[in-house]
Amino acid sequence: MSLDFLPFSRPSIGEDEIAAVEQVLRSGWITTGPQNQELEQRFAERLGCRHAVALSSATGALHVTLLALGIGPGDEVITPSLTWVSTANVITLLGATPVFVDVDRDTLMCSAQAVEAAIGPRTRAIVPVHYAGSTLDLEGLRTVAGRHGIALVEDAAHAVGSEYRGRPVGARGTAIFSFHAIKNLTCAEGAMFVSDDSALAERVRRLKFHGLGVDAYDRLSHGRKPQAEVIEPGFKYNLADLNAALALVQLKRLDALNARRQALAERYLERLAGLPLAPLGLPAHAQRHAWHLFILRIDAEACGLGRDAFMEALKARGIGSGIHFIASHLHHYYRQRQPRLSLPNSEWNSARLCSIPLFPDMRDDDIERVARAIEDILEKRR
């Protein structure tokens, strides 16, 4: 008997989420409105941050954040190459240059030392990445950014619910979270910008909605004049209340969802111990891991087959997997522009990374199924 296909990720959506979305549909106000305002308030309260601004995607959030920081043609932004390519794309589309740095081979995160070595006279910002639910060594990065007077914008797309040295990621400084369909907290598409910089937050809020000082719901609820004025040209990155309502329920469930992810990840670590799979290493500092992804490194010499063949073998057994990620500088567009750039750790991992199924609705026997499939694949290659 064939088993149902097990995807590498699936959103955990229950009756409460469905009811919340239905309530918005019946309310007559489905775009940006009261659900957005509540989501921003609840998210800021959870993190203990000063400002939270909801947007339609983390890519859009990064776009307006860098724009609000004044980044444009001739500027440089330091970021790890081993991340989703949207970061490099946004920097490039602003007319700036992404300066790619290598990552630690085992944690897949960049160090303060690597970032500082890449700083030049045109460096205007640093965009480091919290990876797979694990956390950057923020103290070192904050010290470097402060010493050079450079903006630090944390890519926290993988880190909703993560903690660094006892405090939530995003409690201090500026960070961007993703609510994409596979993230720990999802509303299908969405994001949250957080910051303790009031001027930056105000400009991000303005730029996300046409450069207007207020949105339609703000004008309605506060009795302001019906025609708002453009303060500066902006974009259309506001989050609909349909999405915000879904995110609010997910935010209430976040601790339970992440606890389940942790339990599943711990079971994987137990079951796969001793196999030549090289799961990611953990940083030395105290943290709470959100376990957004469970990543293996499939080395052909150690495992008897390469990553792509391993993924095909999983697929043949009804198990999905993913690659997070191919380093940005290896993509055609960026390789053409920086043909000599060599980042050994990013390149080594790009050829070996494999994300296996991890999502809260997985059963314990799903972990056993994946583990047995992996054992079978490796055994056949010995």
UniProtKB/Swiss-Prot annotation:
Gene3D superfamilies: Aspartate Aminotransferase, domain 1, Type I PLP-dependent aspartate aminotransferase-like (Major domain). It catalyses: UDP-4-amino-4-deoxy-beta-L-arabinose + 2-oxoglutarate = UDP-beta-L-threo-pentopyranos-4-ulose + L-glutamate. One of its GO terms (biological process) is lipid A biosynthetic process. GO terms for molecular function: pyridoxal phosphate binding; UDP-4-amino-4-deoxy-L-arabinose aminotransferase. The modification N6-(pyridoxal phosphate)lysine is found at residue 183. The gene is arnB. This is UDP-4-amino-4-deoxy-L-arabinose--oxoglutarate aminotransferase. Homodimer. Belongs to the DegT/DnrJ/EryC1 family. ArnB subfamily. The keyword Zinc does not apply. Pfam families: DegT_DnrJ_EryC1 (PF01041). One of its GO terms (cellular component) is membrane. It comes from the Bacteria. Its EC number is 2.6.1.87. The lineage of its organism: Bacteria, Pseudomonadati, Pseudomonadota, Gammaproteobacteria, Pseudomonadales. Pathway: Nucleotide-sugar biosynthesis; UDP-4-deoxy-4-formamido-beta-L-arabinose biosynthesis; UDP-4-deoxy-4-formamido-beta-L-arabinose from UDP-alpha-D-glucuronate: step 2/3; Bacterial outer membrane biogenesis; lipopolysaccharide biosynthesis. Its cofactor is pyridoxal 5'-phosphate. Keywords: Aminotransferase, Antibiotic resistance, Lipid A biosynthesis, Lipid biosynthesis, Lipid metabolism, Lipopolysaccharide biosynthesis, Pyridoxal phosphate, Transferase. It is an enzyme of class 2 (transferase). SUPFAM superfamilies: PLP-dependent transferases. Catalyzes the conversion of UDP-4-keto-arabinose (UDP-Ara4O) to UDP-4-amino-4-deoxy-L-arabinose (UDP-L-Ara4N). The modified arabinose is attached to lipid A and is required for resistance to polymyxin and cationic antimicrobial peptides. HAMAP family: ArnB_transfer.
